[in-house]
């Protein structure tokens, strides 16, 4: 049965397919339009450049009146990302508006990468390094960028293992 939330998510998906912003992609799981996989590519000329950061977006039937829960599944060292991968982003909490769609959520997260809000950090260590020891912060971020590449390799290895199992 189609609900208002599911219809809206399908519109969001069509919009992402037709006019995805640079450096972001997202799609619903094949069997559940309420759960999406997303990827944000680290913006150029930032410490996150060339990183491939994966996220999960979980919507409920109150979308778009209620924001989704968004969580990085890639390792992320950032002042506004908790160790669990959950984000501290105003548009996903007190500044949410039903006018936001999947595309605008992801572009907001992408811009947050290089412009953290250090006044209310989710990761105090990252915020302190960002404020007081920028070169150490950049080094830690670059490590997460390199780790994001390894995650891609692990996925390919898993796919190859499945192909081998299928062939046997």
Swiss-Prot record:
It holds the Pfam family UQ_con. GO terms for cellular component: chromosome, telomeric region; cytoplasm; HULC complex; MUB1-RAD6-UBR2 ubiquitin ligase complex; nucleus; Rad6-Rad18 complex; RAD6-UBR2 ubiquitin ligase complex; UBR1-RAD6 ubiquitin ligase complex. It is an enzyme of class 2 (transferase). The active site is at residue 88. InterPro entries: Ub_conjugating_enzyme (IPR050113), UBQ-conjugat_E2_core (IPR000608), UBQ-conjugating_AS (IPR023313), UBQ-conjugating_enzyme/RWD (IPR016135). Residues 4-150 form the UBC core domain. Catalyzes the covalent attachment of ubiquitin to other proteins. Plays a role in transcription regulation by catalyzing the monoubiquitination of histone H2B to form H2BK123ub1. H2BK123ub1 gives a specific tag for epigenetic transcriptional activation and is also a prerequisite for H3K4me and H3K79me formation. Also involved in postreplication repair of UV-damaged DNA, in N-end rule-dependent protein degradation and in sporulation. This is Ubiquitin-conjugating enzyme E2 2. It comes from Debaryomyces hansenii (strain ATCC 36239 / CBS 767 / BCRC 21394 / JCM 1990 / NBRC 0083 / IGC 2968).
């Amino acid at each position: 049965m189609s609900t208002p939330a599911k219809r809206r998510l399908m519109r969001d998906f069509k919009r992402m397919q037709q006019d995805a912003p640079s450096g972001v992609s997202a799609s619903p799981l094949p069997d559940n339009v309420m759960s999406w996989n997303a990827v944000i590519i680290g913006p150029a000329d930032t410490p996150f450049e060339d990183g491939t950061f994966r996220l999960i977006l979980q919507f409920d039937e109150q979308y778009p009146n209620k924001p989704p829960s968004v969580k990085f599944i890639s390792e992320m060292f950032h002042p506004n990302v908790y160790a669990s991968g959950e984000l501290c982003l105003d548009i996903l909490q007190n500044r949410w508006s039903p006018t936001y769609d999947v595309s605008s959520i992801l572009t907001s997260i992408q811009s947050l990468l290089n412009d953290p809000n250090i006044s209310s950090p989710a990761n105090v260590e990252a915020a302190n390094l960002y404020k007081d020891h920028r070169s150490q912060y950049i080094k830690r971020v670059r490590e997460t960028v390199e780790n994001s590449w390894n995650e891609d390799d692990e996925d390919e290895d898993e796919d190859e293992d499945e192909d081998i199992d299928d062939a046997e």
